[in-house]
């Protein structure tokens, strides 16, 4: 058994094992690609505030990949007495760290952009000698931004967005979503640079503000999603748009058991895997341990994401439990 095939006590199916290996490769590729991008932009950043903001955004975009790869080291570990539920929350913590970092730096950049606009800072973009020719540095800035956008928009962004639902990984989904939207930063930075070139100085600051607001929005979304998941909200899909359908499947399965009259479930997302608390109202007064064990095994077989299952016979279903309707 390979380490990529184990999440806590859950052994991943072949599809998920392949997906996690691909995700790791894409995250490593993204780090290398973005590092090269950061170095190239540093050579041409000049005094353009829009370019500086785009440059910083590229640095921030490394956080989700580092958080994902770091969290992956923890979620593979089996539960212990010290951590009886395993370390699956590490993925949610990584998601939260990424969101807070984006939000904090985005706010700082937005304040800087607004301050520059209010004070009327006029950025200047000079010329450079290249192959014996004098070239306006702005053209190099535009060329660099056009080239570097190819990776996130056309390659690793779409690739990660296909892997995120397979792995039920919200951090990977957020990473892919930000990468696919990177074209907005590119367009804004190009507009800011060209604005300086034609004498509209405030376009540079406005572009920097636009990019900053995008960073703030990414930070807010990721922070909000991570916090509500860590606070054990009702388990939702990888994109957080809908309640996860597995809850309904579990309730339907339990109701199909001949000894179960009614059933409901509380399901929380541990970070890629679920902890299940199922409540059943038996048709008869006594329930055997065999019945409970067989039902728990059946629930586990429904989906690879089922990590822990607890089934409690009750006289009345809890109001907060999901009846699957």
Model-derived regions: residue spans:
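Alpha-helical transmembrane cores and adjacent cytosolic helix/loop segments
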Residues: 1-239
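Peripheral (non-transmembrane) domains and long loops of multi-pass membrane proteins
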Residues: 1-27, 77, 219-325
């Amino acid at each position: 058994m390979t380490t990529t095939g184990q999440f806590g006590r859950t052994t991943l199916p072949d599809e998920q094992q392949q997906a996690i290996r691909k995700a790791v490769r894409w995250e490593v590729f993204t780090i290398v690609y973005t590092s090269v991008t950061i170095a190239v932009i540093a050579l041409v950043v000049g005094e353009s505030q829009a370019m500086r903001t785009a440059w910083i955004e590229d640095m921030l975009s490394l956080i989700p990949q580092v958080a994902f790869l770091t969290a992956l080291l923890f979620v593979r570990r089996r539960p212990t007495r010290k951590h009886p539920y395993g370390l699956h929350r590490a993925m949610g913590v990584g998601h939260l760290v990424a969101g807070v970092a984006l939000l904090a730096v985005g706010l700082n950049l937005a304040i800087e952009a607004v301050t520059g606009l209010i004070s009327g800072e006029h950025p200047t973009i000079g010329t450079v000698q290249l192959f014996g020719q004098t070239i306006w540095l702005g053209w190099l800035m535009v060329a660099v931004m056009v080239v570097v956008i190819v990776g996130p928009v056309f390659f690793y962004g779409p690739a990660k967005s296909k892997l995120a639902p397979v792995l039920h990984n919200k951090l990977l989904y957020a990473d892919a979503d930000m990468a696919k939207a990177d074209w907005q930063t590119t367009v804004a930075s190009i507009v800011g640079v060209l604005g300086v070139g034609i004498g509209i100085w405030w376009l540079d600051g406005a572009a920097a503000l636009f990019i900053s607001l995008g960073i703030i929005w990414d930070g807010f979304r990721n922070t909000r999603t991570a916090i509500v998941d860590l606070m054990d909200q009702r388990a939702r899909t990888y994109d957080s748009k809908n309640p996860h359908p597995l809850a309904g499947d579990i309730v339907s399965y339990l109701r199909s058991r001949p000894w179960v009259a009614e059933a409901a479930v509380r399901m929380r997302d541990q970070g890629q895997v679920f902890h299940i608390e199922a409540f059943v109202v038996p048709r008869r007064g006594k329930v055997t341990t065999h019945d409970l064990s067989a039902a728990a095994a059946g629930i586990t077989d429904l989906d690879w994401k089922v990590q822990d299952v607890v089934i409690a016979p009750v006289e009345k279903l809890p109001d907060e439990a999901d009846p699957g309707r």
